Amino acid sequence: MAIYMVDRSLPGITMDQLAAAQSAAIEMGKKLTAEGKSVRYIRSTFVPSESHCMCLFEASTPELVKELNDKANIPYTRVVQAADLTP
């Protein structure tokens, strides 16, 4: 499994809406995994001054990450493979 970063531009989003999007990503990941499509939300970093959000997912392909976000109705600008450098 690889790590993928999802870039998002979210102008005007509230913290409540951001929390709801996070919950939707987590739940859709569980649903897809139960269907045999292993994809997992890891975490997000939000930059309020730029309305920019970067989210990390673990999946075998970027298409699974896109599918999760599309089905959860969470907009994104790109999905790229990344490295999660957790200490």
Residue ranges, per PLM feature:
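Short S/T/G/P-rich N-terminal loop/turn motif that feeds into the first structured element of a domain
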Residues: M1-T33, V47, P62-D70, D84-P87
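Short capping/connector residues at structural and topological boundaries
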Residues: M15-L18, H52, V79
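A short linear hydrophobic-aromatic micro-motif
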Residues: S38-S44, R78
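Amphipathic, hydrophobic secondary-structure cores in small proteins
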Residues: F46-M54
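Short hydrophobic/aromatic beta-strand micro-patches
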Residues: L56-E58
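Conserved short beta-strand edge segments in small beta-sheet-based binding/regulatory domains
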Residues: I74-L85
